[in-house]
Amino acid sequence: MAEQSPESSSPTTWHFAEAQKLTFGEPVTELRVRLVSGTVNVVAAEEGPARLEVTEVDGPPLYVVQDGGTLTVSYEDLPWNGSQGLKQWFETKPWKAWAGSASGRKAWERSVAITLTVPAATQVHVAAVGAAVFVSGISGGTDVNTVSGDATLVGLSGRVKAHTVSGSVEAQSVSGEFGFHSVSGGLTVVDGSGGNVRADSVSGDMLIDLAADPAAPEPVDIFLNSVSGQVAIRLPHPADAKVEANTATGRVSNAFEDLRVSGQMGAKRITGTLGSGAGTLRATTVSGSIALLRRPQADAEGPAAPLTLDKKVL
């Protein structure tokens, strides 16, 4: 049951120990969520105040605080310093004396399922351990940090950053600057129209599918780096970029006649200029393969086929 702080001059707090719905009376401009297990959905509202729907609580109560325009949804014992802070909490706390409770439950044995509806211009920060994250329609900037849970990002604009340890990220129709960092998680970008992508992963695969925005076309600005992950990039038609793609031991595949493939044994490169070379594409992997693909023309019949990694081709 929710408990509201009686002091209106101080931050307003609630504790959710069961399923509950709440509509916030004060405007929300920044959202901070940090959770362990379960699901978190953040959806942009077309109009009206911010809302929270808690459909499941298993473990300690969910702690909600509204301090001015900042709304925080979390637990009282969780740190707020991104995925590394959550990872350290998860790795160290279970082995400390306080980890057990009178009920026999361990500190990390908790789960919630929540949906937050906020104005599209809200700045959104989500940090989670083992929770599935879904964010849709946000234009105020989105920052997602996960330890092992996967994240799905749909229709976002503004700056988007995703940092994972082992979770994968799928970004659909993202139009802002996009940054991704992971140890072993993969990245899939579908119909990305922003053209600005910075991504690095140690072993995760990267599939980048870009679609030009006819209303405001921008040159691509792509920098990808991986150690052992495979990289596949599909560029919009017509493509316009200076290209340099390298792999030390992997295979290469190139669909553009204007690009040159060099290297027979060992290191291989794809280099050259597409169109006027206004954009930049740089991709590097040590042992993974690289594929540069051509997206069908915008007036071609039907949507472009989904981009997948074909290890037989790569």
Protein language model annotation of sequence segments:
Residues 1-164, 168-314:
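Intrinsically disordered, low-complexity terminal regions
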